[in-house]
């Protein structure tokens, strides 16, 4: 039997969750359809209505419950699933001996920041072996701007005896392209870190399903 002939649950058990389409994953989450609409058709209808899985995941309770077959119970389950994913990634970082590459941090930042409706600036504080000391959302802004104070970042880094930091913020517009203001801010934070001998690892911008890394840009420019 080919993968396309398997039902979603059997396909997951045979090939793993990453082999499933968004529709199939949602069908498993919904478990059952409604009268006159099998679960796979219901899942397709939900995705068509919202436009994407991301839009479904960011919908508020009122919008979520507008769809026949979706209710408060499913909304609560979905929010719990999202939170478990966040905590899993946070614990993965906490358990890592070192964060030698930013990819785990990028995954975590995407989970934490991608769905924020306003700009949020977040910092990971690392020890001298690149192990996570703490994480903190330090600054909150509007839909297109957050005021960031480098001195407050440095103050917190010294307070927790951090040897390095990774910073990130989101672009609620979904476009992760770095603006001139983003570049200027990065240089200010770098300079502040240099003064107190705290290593600046990277500044990551989170968009919708995408990200921009200043460190990756620097690497590609030099190679």
Curated annotation (Swiss-Prot):
Which key words are in the record?
Answer: Hydrolase, Metal-binding, Metalloprotease, Protease, Zinc
> Start and end of every MPN domain?
98-220
Query: Which species does this protein come from?
Result: Haemophilus ducreyi (strain 35000HP / ATCC 700724)
What are the recorded GO MF terms, alphabetically? metal ion binding; metallopeptidase activity
The UniProt entry annotates the motif JAMM motif at 169-182
Q: According to the lineage, what is the superkingdom?
A: Bacteria
Report any Pfam family annotated for this entry. Answer: RadC
Chain sites annotated for binding Zn(2+): 169, 171, 182
In Swiss-Prot or TrEMBL terms, this protein is called UPF0758 protein HD_0732
What are its GO biological-process terms?
A: proteolysis
Q: Which family, according to the similarity comment?
A: Belongs to the UPF0758 family.
